[in-house]
Amino acid sequence: MTKTKAFLQKHRWSLTGALLGALVFLVLYGVRVLDPVCVDWILNNPSPDPSQHYLGWVFYRRSGWHLPYLGANYSAIYPYRTSILYTDSIPLLAVVCKLLGGVLPACFQYLGLWGLFCYAMQGGLAQALIARIGGVRPQDTGKNWASVLGAGVLVLFPALHIRMFAHTALAANWLVLLALWVWLCAEQSENRPSTGKLCLWWGVLGLLCAGIHLYYLPMVGMVLVATCVQRGLEKRGPAAVVLPIVSFCAVALAELFVLGAFAANFAGYSNGYLSGADLANLFVPGLGASWEQEVYAGLGTTAAVVLALAGLLVQRKKAAEFFRRHTHIVVAAVVLLILDAVASMGNTVTFGGRTLFTVPIPQVLMDFWAMFSSCARLAWLAGMLLAVAACGLVLRFWNGAAAAVLLAVCAAAQGFGLRTELTKRYTTYHDAAYYEDTTQLTDPAWEQLAASGQFSRLAFASFDFEHDDFWDLVAFAADHGWTSNSFYMGHMDGNLAAVTLAGEMNTLAPDTLYAFIDEDELARSDYALHYYRLDGILLGSVEPIHGLTEEPAVDIPAHTMALQKSSVINGTADADTVTLNEGGELLTEAWMLFPGSYRVTLTGSGFDHSYIYARHGLINQETYKMEVNFTGIAPDEMVFEFSTGEPLYYWRTAVHALNDTPIAVTVIKVEKIG
């Protein structure tokens, strides 16, 4: 009891910051997300990522242990080995929860509690950092309350909110703050820790980063490099500079090996491109070339930086003395910002929305760098460093109550700048309908299938995780302990997955329920299966399914393409019609077609002023324009046929407008005629 009281007394201000973070979380998301057996809100998210995180954990939980790969998952893309790492299911938590699987409920999610933990850690660590930079003593109540207000800037850091329950593992912004805290604790403490203790600390950070999300490895790694730069400037000796880096890298690599990062099938590792940051975007919103490249640090961060600079100018002598006493750590911080700028920009340098230049780099370096292809995320490090440093300097160089008022204004400004996102999250997560079961699999026959014991595996005929039915089917398989032959993975080689799934259809198994989604229905005549339809989904089975009525065979399988999924240039598209103007182009959604002969019929108007063709080709590989035979040519209908002796991956039809005559496309129907 005495030790607990002493701990609470010593860390009361950091715990207050953590409480602030937790309260913000509860206000935004409510308490229902904390219920470990409530999962519908995860599956109802319009993005596939939360479903990936949760169902990845469920499949992993039901997959057996396979040493030495504790993170191996054989259930998600059966019979191949994947890793819990590539479903972004917070691997460390997944492994721990799998070990405790015998005492956990059958339906269990940890994402809600993880979110609460992230917000609390963000607030607690932010307060501790701001207080330390601000030179605040534990007994200085006024300034400590000011540091808690400053922590509000970090609790409202944009990346934390935007990633929470979207890319949930990436919401661990607190890992960067923890690394900064370890740095300051080690370098400003009167009793500096030994090199061995530093190796232990940074080894733990390597363990956390590799076990939560890979993008934190370079961010925290750069903080480590900065600490070693400082130690080098202070001439601590080679061991003090090198060994913490060795410890961090060795622990992270060992953990990645155990998690199966290097032994996963379908892992592409590198996307082959870089999505870099516009560094002006740290202070100016909307400059990111895409949502993924938006790195805005918030209005409150900008305000804090301006106020910190003003304080330094007003108290120039005090500031000069402060920087003189901390020269080495300031130099190391500048090195850190430069490193982060280079890493986050990629090889194409943009500033203020304008591309300045592109640096050619060797392919070997590109392949390594592109493992972190969304490298703009690395700029979060600079944003958080500037935020905590600025808030700390405001606390140090503005007097008394003024600092508290200014930091409160900064926190309020941070929230005001995020008001649209915060309101959206509050509205979404406080809507009772968001927690309802909205699966499209409502036919009672689904549960009969699960209870029959006839099936233990689900197999998709082709690789398409973007279809609505896909996630309902995968959730059904995961909930009932079945395996699936298809899943959405990070860094996945989609080409290999597409080719593999098509090949698996050559060997049919009686314990497998086959799902034919969209264009896959065209191939139904190719396989000696018994076919059934539940909730509009075509299912196939080697053996008859007792209690279900088989769907009659069709003479010519046909399916219509979804026009609203088309890519349209110089035109408009909705569910019914695509209209092309002068120079317009329509490119349909991508399908996988099995070997055979096909007829494609386009209905609409103005086709006598168009150019129509079909193409196919794997992602980032050569695209092949097909030889087709037009059997019907009219202004309101175009028909062409073709044959293929092998599967066609990412097959599409294109329509180009040749002049200023408008072209309307109302239906594109594909038939398998042989």
Short names for language-model regions:
Residues 1-39, 243-244, 320-336:
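Start-transfer (signal-anchor) and selected internal transmembrane alpha helices
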Residues 116-133, 143-187, 195-231, 244-251, ...:
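Membrane-embedded helix bundles of polyisoprenyl
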Residues 138-144, 225, 245-249, 388, ...:
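Signature aromatic-anchored transmembrane alpha helix within multi-pass, membrane-resident enzymes
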Residues 49, 97-101, 114-125, 172-175, ...:
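Transmembrane alpha-helices of multi-pass, membrane-embedded glycan-processing enzymes
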Residues 418-560:
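Extracytoplasmic
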Residues 47-48, 249-313, 552, 558-559:
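Periplasmic/ER-lumenal interhelical loops and adjacent helix-loop junctions
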Residues 25-121, 157, 167:
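Membrane-interface coil-to-helix junctions
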Residues 27-33, 65-68, 149-166, 253-264, ...:
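Membrane-interface helix-loop junctions at the exits of transmembrane helices
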